[in-house]
Amino acid sequence: MRIDILSLFPNMFQATMGESIIGKAQDNGFIDINVTDFRQYTTDKHNHVDDAPFGGGAGMLLQAQPIFDAMDAIHEQTKDQYSKGRVILMDPAGRKFDQAYAKELAQEDHLTFICGHYEGYDERIRNLVTDEASLGDYVLTGGELAAMVMIDATVRFVPGVLGNMSSPMGDSFSNGLLEYPQYTRPADFRGMKVPEVLTSGNHQKIKEWRMRESLRRTLHRRPDLLKTAKLSREQQLMLEDIKLDEDPTVPD
């Protein structure tokens, strides 16, 4: 997978994109990340990439020309090896990013993230994009941090990056639920003991315990997720049992 990033602050990506899983994924050839400073494509003699909005108003807008020209250059560099893929505009009004969206993006061979700054974008820039994405209902200074989060979450699902693909599939949200509690050695730490089932060696019992605790944790911490989670019949019965255990007055 190739990932292109358009930003006025390319140095912001050096630390996060070069370390840990993402850094190793690049070293091993699973992903190729390229950051373009689109200020280099401005035709303005003062290197301006923004201007006041027509009709007046507060703030400055990113101009279309530098971003269009930067995108043209990326297309020329990649057209023989990669598809256009998805072009994602970071925008607080965009589609809210979640685990399902990350899995979706991981199926592409080419992703391009356009990171804004200032008050917003010239509307014509939206003609370049396939997606408009947001982390949530708040505004950041620029799109760089949001792009980093999206890239980190997406790269985990690119085949080969984590080696054991059961690992991301077990993460919180991957099945619509929060992840179950996990423990490592020692089995007894300051009187806090690991649940006996996890040291029993009974894999079926362990699987059932994990499913139950995943449901329990989701019910307690993110009950909203249960409204959209696609629960099996077994999980539905288990959830009803959990609710009844915790509040016997809950109707069947």
Swiss-Prot record:
It is an enzyme of class 2 (transferase). The keyword Cytoplasm applies. S-adenosyl-L-methionine binds at G116, L135, G136, D137, Y138, V139, L140. Its EC number is 2.1.1.228. It catalyses: guanosine(37) in tRNA + S-adenosyl-L-methionine = N(1)-methylguanosine(37) in tRNA + S-adenosyl-L-homocysteine + H(+). GO terms for cellular component: cytosol. Keywords: Cytoplasm, Methyltransferase, S-adenosyl-L-methionine, Transferase, tRNA processing. GO terms for molecular function: tRNA (guanine(37)-N1)-methyltransferase activity. PANTHER family: TRNA (GUANINE-N(1)-)-METHYLTRANSFERASE (PTHR46417:SF1). Belongs to the RNA methyltransferase TrmD family. Specifically methylates guanosine-37 in various tRNAs. This is tRNA (guanine-N(1)-)-methyltransferase. It comes from Limosilactobacillus reuteri (strain DSM 20016). The gene is trmD.
